[in-house]
Amino acid sequence: MGDLSLDTAVHGSEGRYHGDLSDEWEIWGPNGGYLASVALRAVAAESRFVRPASLSCHFLSGAAFGPVDLDVVHLRRAKRAESLRVTMTQTERKVLEALVWMIDTAQGLHHDYAPMPDAPTPSGLPSTEELTDEPRSKRYSFFTNVEERPTSWIDDWEHREPGEPRMASWFRFRPVATFDDLVVDACRSLILMDTLEWPAAVRAYSGQLPWVAPSLDLSVRFHRFEPDCEWLLSDTTAAIATDGLIGGAASVWSATNRLLASGGEQMLCRPVPPPA
């Protein structure tokens, strides 16, 4: 089982940082949101501000578990905001490139017209582990790091009817559920927003599919933080698939019905490799 704060930690200074990708965050290799989280930690270490405003990244090549290097440069320094670029490399191969805005918290306009999705509370829902007979050993290690309580469930997955490509689940990280550090708290949203687009997309089809679709990019806006809130709702749609791309939008909500983060990503379809 991984620990989000420990497994995204970086060390270094003056624009040069190092991290170590943990295999506890595996889904088809290191989870994309996990990679973005390590990159965000490096940016936060370099910035004089503590509040992330947005992150946009490209996944450039597959990463392996183990050491990574992160180079961070300032693109703009202003009184209340900084724009920074971070490049993650592994054995001289570029893995990820991201742009991040970090800001100083300040007074400004305030309104909230974001409607909470219609979803039951997590307290009345069973966990994925209670809903499936699949042994934990057959699941990706990523899922040991979160307790998931889906708002809907398909019992007979192999014979499912095609439906709306949407998935919503409540998640609680484990073994540690909440983090006082705003950047680590933001990492919770980053990871959840990269996790459900493929499961949402495949709900539009039945049976086994001849394609998989890794993420090309990820873009997230951090609206607010509730670091004391254990349960987060991740609501994801993959509304369109065309030209070999699957486009999705995602949002993360607190158990107090407030929007924490929003964004989306594009995934690129690739044929499923033939059996060995």
PLM regions and their residue ranges:
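Terminal targeting signals and extreme-terminal segments of soluble enzymes
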Residues: M1-A276
